Amino acid sequence: MSNGKKIFISHSSKDQEYVDAFIQLLKKFGFRTQDIFYSSTIETGVQPGELIFDTIKRELTNQPVMLYFLSDHYYQSIPCLNEMGASWMLSDKHYPIALNNFSMKDMKGVISSERLAIAFNDKTSTNEINCLLKKLSHDTDVQAEPDFELNVEKNIQPFQNKLTQLIRQASYLKPDEKGYFETILSTHRPVYGTAKGVYDCFKLPSLIEPKSLGLDTLSEDESHWLFFFLTWGTFQEGEKVRFKLKKDKAYNNREFSDIGKCKNIYVSYLEKVE
C-alpha cells in the first residue's frame, strides 16, 4: 500500500513519449494509476470539468514525490518553470531526470545539477534505473511486484529499448515545412570508376528520417551518404549545406566492405549555407 504520497511528473508535453515509457515502467514495477499524477493523460491527470491549475495546486499541496523530466523543452516552458518553483516550496523529495542531449550545465532555477538523479540516454544502465525505482518505492511505500523483483533486468529491458528507439528517432534529420534539410557534411568518400569526375559523396552525420524516404523503419547499422553531381559545386567536410531529396528516387541501398550497409541519398537541390 502507498503511504498516500503520489509521484508528480513535471514535464514538457513535447517530451511526452519519454515520460509515457517511464510511466509504463512504474506500473510494471507496482505503482497504480492513483499513485501517479501525470497531466498528459486523463487517467493520471486532470479530470473532465476540472481546471488544470487548480488540480496542480491541489496535487502539490499534498507534498508529492517530484520527478522533473528536464530538457530544453522544459526550460522553454513557463508552466514547467512555475511548477518547479512551486514544488520546491511544497515538497521535500525531488528527482531531476535529464533527458537525452540535455547538459547538466544547462540546469537552472532551484533544481541544481548536484541534485541530478539520473540521465536517460543510450548508456543508462539497468542498475541505475532500478536504483531510482527503489528510491521512489521507499518514498511512497509502494512495493515492487514479486515478478518484477524476480527478474529486474527482463522487466526494465523494454523501457531501455524504447529509450534507445526514441533517442535514435530524435537524432534523425528532418525537413523544414518547405522540404529542405540542413546539416553539416561529414566524412568525404572518394568516388571511383565511371562515377569519378561526375559525382561526389559525403557522409551525413545523422540518418534521414524514414518517413521522408517513404519507409517505416531504418536498419540499425546503416549509414547515409549524400551522393550528388559535381555540377552542384565543390564542397568540403564540415561545411553546412541545405538540400532537398529527389522526388522520383531519394535513395539507393548499397553495401561495401569498409562501411557496411548504407544508402546513397540523391538530391534535387543542394547549396552551401553561410
UniProtKB/Swiss-Prot annotation:
The active site is at residue 83. Its EC number is 3.2.2.6. NAD(+) binds at residues 12-13, 47. Keywords: Hydrolase, NAD, Virulence. Residues 3-140 form the TIR domain. InterPro entries: TIR_dom, Toll_tir_struct_dom_sf. GO terms for molecular function: NAD+ nucleosidase activity; NAD+ nucleosidase activity, cyclic ADP-ribose generating; phosphatidylinositol-3,4,5-trisphosphate binding; phosphatidylinositol-3,4-bisphosphate binding; phosphatidylinositol-3,5-bisphosphate binding; phosphatidylinositol-3-phosphate binding; phosphatidylinositol-4,5-bisphosphate binding; phosphatidylinositol-4-phosphate binding. One of its GO terms (biological process) is NAD catabolic process. It catalyses: NAD(+) + H2O = ADP-D-ribose + nicotinamide + H(+). It is an enzyme of class 3 (hydrolase). The keyword Hydrolase applies. The TIR domain mediates NAD(+) hydrolase (NADase) activity. Self-association of TIR domains is required for NADase activity. Interacts with host MYD88. Virulence factor that suppresses host Toll-like receptor (TLR)-mediated cytokine production upon infection. Acts as a NAD(+) hydrolase (NADase) by catalyzing cleavage of NAD(+) into ADP-D-ribose (ADPR) and nicotinamide. This is NAD(+) hydrolase TcpF. It comes from Enterococcus faecalis (strain ATCC 700802 / V583). The gene is tcpF.
